[in-house]
Amino acid sequence: MTVFVDHKIEYMSLEDDAELLKTMAHPMRLKIVNELYKHKALNVTQIIQILKLPQSTVSQHLCKMRGKVLKRNRQGLEIYYSINNPKVEGIIKLLNPIQ
């Protein structure tokens, strides 16, 4: 019985990992997450300036990653985004080993 439960937990963990990878699996999202990894926290305006992307594009991708990949923290009128998941940091390190 314990073996079955262990396999079920492992399977659920793999499903969560697959969902995380699916959420990140877009070039623009990877760029955003990479910048957040480098800078620790950025607001939307800063991300727009760094990546030279339209505000609507950045906001759309941030919305898709909120919760699973990113967290937001309000500081006055600004909302700062940062990486919410240690697995995400591991993925970025794997993709950019020189940083």
Curated annotation (Swiss-Prot):
Pfam family, one: HTH_5
Record feature DNA-binding region, as residue ranges: 43-62
Keyword Transcription regulation carried by entry: yes
The organism's place on the tree of life at top rank: Bacteria
Keywords: DNA-binding, Plasmid, Repressor, Transcription, Transcription regulation
SMART domains per record: HTH_ARSR (SM00418)
Gene3D superfamilies the record matches: Winged helix-like DNA-binding domain superfamily/Winged helix DNA-binding domain (1.10.10.10)
Record function comment: Represses the expression of the pagA and atxA genes.
Protein name: Transcriptional repressor PagR
